[in-house]
């Protein structure tokens, strides 16, 4: 068994392989691997990061890697895993998304990046029917789960054709770019096998085209990885701050962290076992979560940004917000639940209720009497205390802390 396949299996990454013998042969012949990325948003997110890391794993073994941006397929929308028709993206938005996704893929994967629109820009509809449609039988498509599951509720010819486009992508890359392996999530099996069938029909049985799918990364509750309560954690720090990403990772459960270390980092499998043993010896230290957060954040945003996120976390949970500089403070408040005020002052009890920090006057008084409430690092005990805009940080916002770890942002009205 090839040592790369051995590593992927040890990490429990592999869901299925179309033909392991061909996969080994492709690796031995230095054939490349590609992964497709959907430009449905203007940034990749942590869920996509699994496939980015897969490309990095192959690069460690000097295997050619290619990232394919779906400029053409993105105009249609992949029906895989969808129970209803997808809305078509506006072309202007799609082009902006493609440019941003391409930039991220070049940055994070260090791979060749191709927009699959180049395969179709000069192809007429009649060309498509003759050169692509003739390669695949309708019955073959109808048997696929991604299409069959939609027949009862309906599927447009547009989405029905998606499978052919992704299959044709594989054929083009196999013929022209020395690519013999396609990888994707477990929901991509049907699309991958269509490409292999097209290659067989076009080039004969003596080919080494193969595919592998990666296990869906879900948490212990069965939910897809990569989303916080506020939504997806994006790789673009303008959409999700580095601090938000760090907090998302550091707060992963003990039940999930070993799987995440295997899926999302290049840390050696044996080293992960040692990390988990150290974690089990003293779970309160969160050794495994810290290793996960450091590995992922450093890989995506760099050491300096990681250290900044770590510093913000340590200050918010153990120190004083007054020690944060302006940049760090602005990063920190982006992740806090916010309440806007259109007045210049408010009673503390009313504010606690308004910001959903307490659910009643009685509970608000209890928080105050037990010294649980701090505003901009100042403990408030007086239930008649007036919170004023003039005392806010830069007269723009106040930060309320309840207990040791719960922070809330108050945004004051502009003059």
From Swiss-Prot:
Domain of life, source organism: Bacteria
Protein keywords: Aminoacyl-tRNA synthetase, ATP-binding, Cytoplasm, Ligase, Nucleotide-binding, Protein biosynthesis, RNA-binding
Pfam families, alphabetized: SYY_C-terminal (PF22421), tRNA-synt_1b (PF00579)
Gene Ontology terms for molecular function: ATP binding; RNA binding; tyrosine-tRNA ligase activity
A biological-process GO annotation: tyrosyl-tRNA aminoacylation
Residues noted as binding ATP in the record, renumbered to the chain: 227
Domain (S4 RNA-binding) ranges: 346-413
Catalytic activity: tRNA(Tyr) + L-tyrosine + ATP = L-tyrosyl-tRNA(Tyr) + AMP + diphosphate + H(+)
Segments carrying motif 'KMSKS' region: 224-228
Chief site of localization: cytoplasm
Cellular component terms (Gene Ontology): cytosol
EC assignment: 6.1.1.1
Residues noted as binding L-tyrosine in the record, renumbered to the chain: 34, 162, 166
Motif 'HIGH' region, residue numbers: 39-48
Subcellular location: Cytoplasm
Function: Catalyzes the attachment of tyrosine to tRNA(Tyr) in a two-step reaction: tyrosine is first activated by ATP to form Tyr-AMP and then transferred to the acceptor end of tRNA(Tyr).
Subunit structure: Homodimer.
Protein family according to the UniProt entry: Belongs to the class-I aminoacyl-tRNA synthetase family. TyrS type 1 subfamily.
Protein name: Tyrosine--tRNA ligase
Species this protein is from: Ureaplasma parvum serovar 3 (strain ATCC 700970)
Lineage of origin: Bacteria, Bacillati, Mycoplasmatota, Mycoplasmoidales, Mycoplasmoidaceae
């Amino acid at each position: 068994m090839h040592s790369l396949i051995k590593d992927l299996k040890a990490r429990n990454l592999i869901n299925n392989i179309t033909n392991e013998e061909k996969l080994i042969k492709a690796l031995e012949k230095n054939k490349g691997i590609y992964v497709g990325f959907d430009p449905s948003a203007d940034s990749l997110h942590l869920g996509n990061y699994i496939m980015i890391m897969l490309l990095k794993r192959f690069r460690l073994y000097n295997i050619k890697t290619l990232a394919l941006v779906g400029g053409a397929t993105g105009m249609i929308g992949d029906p895989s895993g969808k129970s209803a028709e997808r809305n078509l993206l506006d072309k202007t938005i799609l082009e902006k998304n493609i440019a941003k996704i391409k930039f991220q893929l070049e940055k994070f994967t260090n791979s060749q990046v191709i927009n699959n629109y180049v395969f179709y820009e000069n192809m007429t509809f009649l060309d498509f029917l003759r050169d692509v449609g003739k390669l695949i039988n309708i019955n073959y498509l109808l048997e696929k789960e991604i299409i069959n599951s939609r027949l009862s509720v309906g599927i447009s010819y547009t989405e029905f054709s998606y499978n052919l486009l992704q299959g044709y992508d594989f054929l083009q890359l196999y013929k022209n770019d020395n690519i013999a392996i396609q990888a994707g999530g477990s929901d991509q099996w049907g699309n991958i096998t269509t490409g292999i069938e097209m290659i067989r029909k076009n080039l004969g049985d003596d080919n080494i085209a193969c595919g592998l799918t990666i296990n869906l990364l879900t948490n212990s509750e069965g939910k897809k990885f990569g989303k916080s309560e506020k939504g997806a954690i994006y790789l673009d720090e303008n959409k999700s701050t580095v601090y938000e990403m760090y907090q998302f990772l550091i707060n992963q459960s003990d039940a999930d962290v070993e799987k995440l270390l295997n899926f999302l980092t290049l840390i050696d499998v044996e080293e992960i076992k040692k990390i988990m043993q150290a974690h089990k010896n003293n779970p309160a230290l969160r050794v495994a979560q810290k290793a996960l957060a450091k590995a992922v954040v450093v890989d995506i945003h760099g050491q300096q940004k990681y250290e900044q996120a770590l510093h913000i976390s340590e200050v918010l949970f153990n120190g004083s917000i007054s020690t944060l500089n302006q940049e760090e403070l602005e990063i920190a408040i982006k992740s806090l639940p916010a309440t806007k005020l259109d007045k210049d002052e408010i009673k503390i009890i009313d504010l606690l209720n308004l910001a959903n920090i307490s659910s009643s006057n009685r509970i608000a008084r209890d928080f105050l009497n037990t010294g649980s409430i701090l505003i901009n690092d100042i403990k408030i005990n007086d239930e008649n205390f007036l919170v004023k805009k003039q005392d806010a940080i830069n007269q723009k916002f106040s930060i309320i802390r309840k207990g040791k770890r719960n922070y809330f942002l108050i945004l004051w009205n502009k003059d």
